[in-house]
């Protein structure tokens, strides 16, 4: 079994001009979260062809997602090509998503990495970096993510200093941060990353704002002392990129803020958009003032009562 937490990007640049997919990606800052993707892998037939593996995917509401396996079959083909898997046996692979797709929680990257590392547990071949590089390339090939694989590789609260795949041109750092947080999203909404990163106007706005934000935080140690800078720059990024001005996001953020005010927690939390969904994360304003279990439960129940979806999770650091 393999479990990989999701990832939230708080601000970023779009850097996909490189000829090689392994050098494309993004720079920026993000947070790894505990909820993500769980994978169970077992042998189906010891003499069977790996291409005949059974792959079942379940969404966060435990409903089977049909016709969603091509992504993972591409991964298995690439692992065989790289000699990290043999052409037999065939497998039974069950993939369970713990959060919705297309809401900025990196379910595609987490799913790929979870399946890749489950295959590595079985084959006991290659380095972790090799598997992450393959996952990054598939993400770029499908336009489903820029820096999620590199962010997950770093763990915790991460900064991506150079775009690309881990172990190729990509460079990222992460620090541990034991904090409960709350994810909130608009249930009917979903947005594919490519809508923004393939649009020249959005790409320019996002990258300009992302460069400004990153330049303000990249110098100096990467640790808890940067928390205020991260909160400040993620707020500025949302305004400068104009992502927070889109009507759906603007209305969504207003609704979230009014609920936070109604339970009188506005002085203890900061609301930040998750790139690029109609979703946000509630982060502690100060790391020495952790939200209590009661406060977390109150927030979650109020969001759900008001027609939003919410999940209590935590910042995650995987060694």
Predicted regions and their residues:
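Alpha/beta catalytic cores of group-transfer enzymes, especially the acyltransferase/condensing modules
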Residues: 129-173
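ATP-binding N-lobe of GHMP and related small-molecule kinases
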Residues: 1-101, 124, 313-319
